[in-house]
Design a protein with these regions (language model features):
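Residue-level detector of well-ordered alpha-helical segments, enriched
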Residues: 165, 217-220, 257-260, 318
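Short acidic alpha-helical/loop segments enriched in Asp/Glu that coordinate divalent cations
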Residues: 231-253, 270-280
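C-terminal structured domains
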Residues: 247, 258-263, 267-268, 278-377
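Short charge-dense sequence patches
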Residues: 202-208, 249-257
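Phosphate/adenylate-binding glycine loop and adjacent helical scaffold
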Residues: 1-218, 229, 233, 272, ...
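Alpha-helical phosphate/pyrophosphate-handling elements in metalloenzyme active cores
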Residues: 221, 225
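Secondary-structure capping and boundary motifs in well-ordered enzyme cores
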Residues: 213, 217, 253-257, 293, ...
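Hydrophobic/aromatic-lined pockets within catalytic cores
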Residues: 174, 226-233, 265-273, 306-309, ...
Length: 377
């Protein structure tokens, strides 16, 4: 959703508008009992480290694709965050599947595909870390960036929007931040939201509206924040950068309202969907961007993440960070492989005992993740 011209991008405005979206919801509801079930399973599931082996599968899940110096790694994080959306394609039958490509001789499935393309560009001398290069990007640059080596084609969708995002990053970085993302962090000074409108989430929404504009849901800004928190913990940044990444108001985090989280939630029964939405998902039909169907499952996903984090107890921010990883991975790595009657030996899953699609409504197992042609998630 694009913000209105009168948007202030304050946290208070965001909470009010998110509440209004939930009040208007008609296609999706939340199941409190199933929320308690999932909240009781998620911490132990995540603690097993089950996600880690998928670094070595075609998903390459969570595996860094290139190692760079500190400032370059931050710059790449911005570029990657502006492109990590619409990561699916249609197969030869018209059914939706995760984006699948061969990059530098390796097969990739899902979100790691885009990261592999960014790394390939850098290794081949296309300096996507330079704001001037980004500002001058052409359609040929985008097509070369996302070309599948196995087919010679470009399976990534909405190339015009991807080109616009590359160019916006470059021009705004040059105009406002001396070409460097670290200066965005310096202006935010360790806050997601500030009274003067210069918090990190606010800067992304306000100054990069093509790349990050999605108000009040702010999926890409929030997912970018989660990735920066993980990046900070995975390496030893200089003191200044480390301080800038220690956001002081993490209580203002929200879960990412994308398509994988609601897919897991509807499969397991955290979300209850009506027949109209279920029919579209079973038929792999597009949902109109900005429609009530889209707004309903996205707003409900944010509320579900809040309730799950509270139900887990303890540190709310730590719970939300765990859920952000667990729910996305569960959908891509497990739900995608699941079917009615699959054995625990073939696909271990701690949520199977409470899974609505498995035990109550088998039609939910036919549902694909929500399909929207959008650059917001």
């Amino acid at each position: 959703m694009q913000a209105t011209k009168s948007a202030t991008f304050s946290r208070e405005e965001q909470l009010r508008q998110l509440g209004e979206l939930r009040e208007r919801t008609t296609h999706v509801d939340l199941n409190d009992a199933r929320i308690r079930d999932v909240a009781g399973i998620a911490p132990a599931s995540f603690a097993t480290g089950w996600i880690r082996p998928f670094q070595d599968t075609d998903e390459h899940y969570g595996k860094p694709q290139i190692g760079l110096a500190d400032l370059d790694q931050l710059q790449l994080a911005l570029v990657a965050a502006s492109q990590i959306w619409l990561i699916w394609q249609r197969d030869e039958t018209g059914r939706a599947i995760p984006l699948t490509m061969t990059v530098e001789g390796t097969k990739f499935v899902g979100s790691a595909t885009l990261g592999a393309c960014h790394a390939r560009a850098i290794r081949r001398g296309q300096n996507i870390l330079d704001a001037g290069v980004l500002a001058g990007f052409t359609m040929k640059d985008v097509e070369d960036h996302y070309r599948d080596e196995a087919t010679g084609r470009v399976p990534v969708q909405l190339l015009d929007e991807r080109l616009a995002n590359f160019r916006e990053l470059g021009s705004v970085l040059q105009r406002e931040f001396d070409g460097h993302f670290v200066n965005v962090l310096r202006r935010a000074d360790g806050y997601l939201f500030k009274p003067d409108g210069n918090g990190f989430i606010q800067l992304l929404e306000r100054l990069f509206p093509r790349s990050f504009g999605d108000w009040p849901l702010a999926k890409l800004p929030y997912v970018f924040t989660f990735s920066l928190l993980d990046l900070r913990e995975s390496r030893h940044f200089p003191e200044e950068i480390d301080r800038l990444l220690r956001f002081k108001d993490l209580q203002n985090l929200e879960g990412g309202a994308d398509y994988y989280r609601p897919w897991f939630f509807l499969r397991v029964g955290v979300l209850t969907i009506d027949d109209e939405l279920k029919s579209r998902l079973r038929k792999h039909q597009l949902i109109e961007a900005g429609s009530s169907l889209e707004n309903d499952y996205r707003a409900a996903t944010i509320e579900a993440m809040r309730r799950l984090a509270r139900a887990m107890g303890g540190d709310y921010v730590a719970a939300l960070r765990l859920l952000e990883r667990e729910t996305h991975a569960q959908a891509l790595l497990r739900c995608r492989r699941c079917r009615v009657g699959i054995s625990d030996e073939e696909l271990p899953c701690p949520y199977r005992g409470v899974c609505k699609a498995t035990h109550v409504d088998h039609e939910l197992m036919d549902c694909v993740f929500p399909l929207v042609l959008t650059s917001e998630y």
